[in-house]
């Protein structure tokens, strides 16, 4: 009988072999890897890397196989990820990225990026994504406000300075 730690080690080694142990990652057995990540999460639901890798693989399967059922499955797991790990910028930032790039819903992406920047460990790139999204959806007032907010937190942030100058020039 394996301990949970031994089982996790075995699962992660198998994932590594199936995903990265092939000459081209496109040759990996993504559905099997997704199932292995589900097993990892049964043992340790706090493994943010497992959540994010599994969701990315589901999105990749949807794109590569032109099968939207994988995308719907990915969204289901995105919501579960947030419900189990709601605290911390990383969950919200990743989900903002999911809705920005994978399951396109820019307004929902903005909401999650806004949640992410409330945490003290939010990175400049989170602000950059939020600013770019606000500009893209035409909310220049919010974009400007987030530039100012980013500059308060990250003095001399070149991206925020550049965007602020562009927004003020309009």
Place the predicted regions along the sequence by residue.
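N-terminal leader/linker segments that initiate helical-solenoid repeat arrays
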Residues: 1-36
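Terminal, low-structured helical/coil segments at or just beyond the last alpha-helical repeat
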Residues: 1-2, 11, 124, 136-170
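Short coil/turn linking the two alpha-helices of tandem helical-hairpin repeats
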Residues: 15-27, 55, 59-66, 96-104, ...
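Structural signature of tandem alpha-helical TPR/SEL1-like repeats
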Residues: 28-35, 64-79, 102-115, 137-146
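Structural marker of alpha-solenoid helical repeat scaffolds
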Residues: 43, 84-85, 118-119, 152-154
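Residue-level recognition of tetratricopeptide repeat
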Residues: 47, 88, 122-123, 156-157
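Alpha-solenoid helical repeat scaffolds
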Residues: 52-53, 90-94, 124-132, 145, ...
């Amino acid at each position: 009988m394996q301990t949970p730690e031994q089982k996790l080690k075995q699962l992660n080694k198998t994932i590594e072999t199936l995903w990265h142990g092939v000459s081209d990652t496109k040759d990996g057995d993504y559905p099997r890897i997704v199932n292995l990540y589900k097993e990892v999460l049964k043992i340790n639901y706090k493994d943010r890397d497992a959540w994010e890798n599994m969701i990315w693989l589901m999105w990749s399967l949807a794109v590569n196989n032109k099968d939207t059922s994988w995308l719907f499955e990915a969204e289901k797991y995105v919501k579960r990820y947030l419900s189990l790990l709601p605290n911390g910028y990383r969950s919200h930032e990743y989900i903002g990225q999911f809705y920005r790039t994978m399951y396109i819903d820019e307004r929902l992406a903005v909401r999650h990026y806004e949640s992410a920047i409330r945490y003290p460990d939010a990175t400049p790139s989170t602000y950059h994504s939020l600013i770019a999204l606000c500009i893209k959806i035409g909310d220049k007032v919010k974009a400007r406000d987030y530039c100012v907010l980013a500059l308060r937190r990250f003095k001399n942030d070149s991206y925020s300075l550049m965007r602020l100058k562009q927004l003020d020039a309009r």
